[in-house]
């Protein structure tokens, strides 16, 4: 048992949302002093040039970023590069502040190496995040994930997303339109092409920042194809695949059905996330940047996503179960694999297994 695994057993005795708050506060405190932050970054951040790539015209020092959901309000913008991430996606943030769903709303599924959440986009609002981003001098790229305010009716969703895009687009490296969380009533209905088209068109009209859309793993293959075609048609920069799943199939943790509704992240979503990635790559090729998220735990998992078409990767649940060195281990393993397979750059490996 590693040191973190022993510590994790203790941390897992405390309620998930409470320990998240405590650990996040500790990480921010440790990475606030310049000297300590730079020392950590010097040891943990991806430095191997083989890992660097240019995506959206921006240099990413490593492909693995922190997924949306951990740092909803951009409170830890300096923290993530110091912990070895190549970038971070903050949010989901909505046009108006909202408290999210009642607690408890975050649960561990330890036998499945998974989490179940029904957070409901609890956040301080787009204006507050814009203030933080304005003050921030970036050590790494920062994406922003935007969602619909719960109180906004579906027929006003376009303006709700557009408002967030106006405020945050100029301050973000890239903008992700989240229409795939299962925890806001009716949100996933916006993935239907006839609903999605006006939202994406409006968001693109508000900003020159690269715009991506985040999709659910529970979509049918036909729906995945339609969204890929729409993204290409509208000139989107890419797709983030995938969000959490509402499926409970194959879960081993006792009592999971009694926990209530929510989205499952981590190992149980890995297979479908990979399937969706491969389908998107076959459909769109290099016309879209694909960011793969969902069930990435090891460097081998990361390698499979890269060679299946992902230019960038993300993780949240893997970080919770893997600990503070998780991102470094992924990046180190990827660098070793790239060289072993004869690649001189990460970009050359993207989609290589799909071209054989």
UniProtKB/Swiss-Prot annotation:
The active site is at residue 181. Substrate binds at residues 72, 117-121, 178, 183, 243-244. It is a peripheral membrane protein. Its EC number is 1.3.5.2. Its cofactor is FMN. FMN binds at residues 68-72, 92, 145, 178, 214, 242, 266, 295, 316-317. GO terms for molecular function: dihydroorotate dehydrogenase (quinone) activity. InterPro entries: Aldolase_TIM, DHO_dehydrogenase, Dihydroorotate_DH_2, Dihydroorotate_DH_cat, Dihydroorotate_DH_CS. It is found in: Cell membrane. Its main location: membrane. It catalyses: (S)-dihydroorotate + a quinone = orotate + a quinol. Binds 1 FMN per subunit. GO terms for biological process: 'de novo' pyrimidine nucleobase biosynthetic process; 'de novo' UMP biosynthetic process. Catalyzes the conversion of dihydroorotate to orotate with quinone as electron acceptor. Belongs to the dihydroorotate dehydrogenase family. Type 2 subfamily. This is Dihydroorotate dehydrogenase (quinone). It comes from Mycobacterium sp. (strain KMS). The gene is pyrD.
